[in-house]
Amino acid sequence: MDIDIVDLDHVAVRVSDLDAALEFYHDLLGMEIRDRQRYEQGEVPYVAVVAGGRHIHLVPTDEPIDVSSGHLCLLVRSGEMETEAEIEALIEELRAAGVTVEDGEPYERYGAYGRDWAVYVRDPDGRRVELKLH
């Protein structure tokens, strides 16, 4: 088999409350919204949020959602945050907005672009989301 994977197009995640998910990913984290009108017109089963050209499809469902394993990792531009103190300030802003931040955060972690400060938070469905400096 001769397959040449060149990039990631999207990841789909089920959400129990689309408005709460958009408040988290768009309003709090600043991700661009795409396909909302197409969703509302019934053309697609999701609303996308976008970071760096990569899409997360938020797929509303009434079925139970299992978020007990895995996580999403979103890169935060390091030009805006370069120190532990700055990511601590971000954590306080997220907590003030009602976002659950895991105990013991922030922490330096390795990722696709090396080691840097990161924090694990939970989205409205309890899904683990890593915000990692880049």
Identify the role of each PLM range:
Residues 32-40, 106-110, 134:
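Conserved catalytic-core motifs of GNAT/GCN5-like acyltransferases
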Residues 14-56:
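Core segments of cupin and vicinal oxygen chelate
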Residues 40-45, 66, 112-115:
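Short acidic/glycine-enriched loop/turn segments that link adjacent beta-strands
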Residues 18-19, 73-125:
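Vicinal oxygen chelate
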Residues 49-52, 121-124, 134:
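Active-site beta-strand termini and strand-to-loop segments that position acidic
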Residues 59, 64-78:
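Helix-adjacent hinge/juxtasegments
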Residues 1-19, 72:
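N-terminal beta-strand motif that seeds the catalytic metal site of vicinal oxygen chelate
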